[in-house]
Amino acid sequence: MNFYVTSGTPDYMEKLIVKNPQQPLILLHGNGNSVVLHETDKKSIFAVPRKFEVIAQDGQFTQKGYFTFFNMPIMSDERPVFEKKALDVIPALNSNDAVIAYRLLRPVKAETYLFIIQWGGPASYEVWKDSNEYKKE
């Protein structure tokens, strides 16, 4: 499965969503910038996408909730060790009722992995961040 991420101004990203109603796109707004997520087995509809392969997943992203993005630059020779450690975190997320969905993403043409987790809300993320599970990871 391919996963694409693009970013831009809120206005432009909203127009992208309206222009592609048939696509499963998720629009997220942040500090003056917006991000659109697209998961598909086809080519990207974005002009300038960041392309990833999905290596672990659960649930379906929805427009509601709170998203955390973990960007992790990993050199190519360190990828196998990193992926094993990252996959070891998955059972803790699977057992967390506050997690709506997640994707662990391997970069296709870059070195920065992306781990996106959707939570029920910011308080859910804060509780997890303060937990022993998070601290040991």
Positions of predicted regions on the chain:
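Mixed-charge, glycine-accented linear interaction segment located at domain edges/termini
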Residues: 133-136
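Short beta-strand micro-motifs enriched in acidic
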Residues: 105-107
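Short S/T/G/P-rich N-terminal loop/turn motif that feeds into the first structured element of a domain
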Residues: 1-98, 110-112, 124-130
